[in-house]
Amino acid sequence: MKDLYQDLLRYYCFAIGKLPDEANFLKAMKETVTPEELRIFFMLPFTGNIAERKLLSRARRAGVGREEFFKRAGRLVEQGMIMRYSRPGGQTYERGNIVHMSEQQVRIKDDTPRRRVFARLMDAAIEGEIGLTPNRTPFYRVLPVEETLAGESRQIDMDKQVRDPRAVLPLDIASAMVRAEPLVAVADCYCRAARRIVGKDCGHPLETCLTFNELAETLLEAGLARRIDHAEAVQILQNCEREGLVHFVDNAEGRIRSLCNCCPCSCILLSVLKRDEGNAGGPSRYVIRYSGASIPELAQCVQICPMGALSYNGTLTVNHRRCIGCGLCVSRCRELGHGDALRLVPRGKHPRIHRSNEALWKQITRESAVGLIVNKLKGKK
């Protein structure tokens, strides 16, 4: 008889490579979901979504009645295994991607063996002890501190300098992206929650992960998020900037699903970027430019950089390869009264931003599949 738990393990390993503790992972999943529920999970397509009526048809052909289907599917939603949300044509289902599936296990408040397993899994990823998907396309991209996006200066009549807004697009502005989404919820930061569980709490705020639309609907149904209005969401963004956290958003245009606020001490996106490995997150469309002004207090602006891209010894040195264009140093320098000693300018080349979340994840899945095959041929684990 087919072992669906082994199939689930292979599904995880497809995305993140060999798990550090497969035996405990399997034990935890056996405590979390039943084989009957996993049958429903594997009826969903590998990527993309499926309409409820089509999924019901598949279940019926497999001998699962309507009442039993909804019971099993509801449990999978509660456990973060699948997503269920409304579309104009009715309810729609999709597998939670590996990140989503892992996040929900950690966000569950009960202290269970599976929660501890997934917290250790996340901690191992943050520490670089396990590999990540061999994709080239970043899952997320940085959004700069909004007040630092003034655009370039250009000359107009009467010899006056004004800011040119043409370089700044709505996809660069966090508050504009948040206000464009009809449904917003806030959840605990997955990374910091995991670190807290394993005894590595960094002290940064926990309730900072913004989710939208389908993802927000799924988390709200599972009781793992809190619905908020646009004003509170924007306030959370501003509070996170004051904390020195970096905004990361889905690397896609159109509707967004998540906006993370990451710290360099606990969050995987910054950890991977600092180690210069993998492609979990990409930089913003901007990079730092230094005016050349000799200001001793610039040393205070250097300290806030989450990437160690700045150094000061009488003059400022910028490592543009490490600068992710978050704008935290620019914001700090302006607070200290140094004007435009540092400012953000458009980056010459930045990672491609995909047209939609669906297109983004299809591309990442293709790249991961090819990368895993290549790694296997080369004998890599």
Show where each model-derived region lies.
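Long, low-complexity, charged/polar intrinsically disordered regions in eukaryotic proteins
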Residues: M1-K27, N251
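Short amphipathic alpha-helical interaction segments
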Residues: A62-E78
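A short, conserved structural fragment
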Residues: G74-P88, L310-S311, G339-L342
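Catalytic cores of enzyme domains
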Residues: E129-V287
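Flanking helices and flexible, charged tails adjoining ferredoxin-like Fe-S electron-transfer domains
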Residues: H320-K381
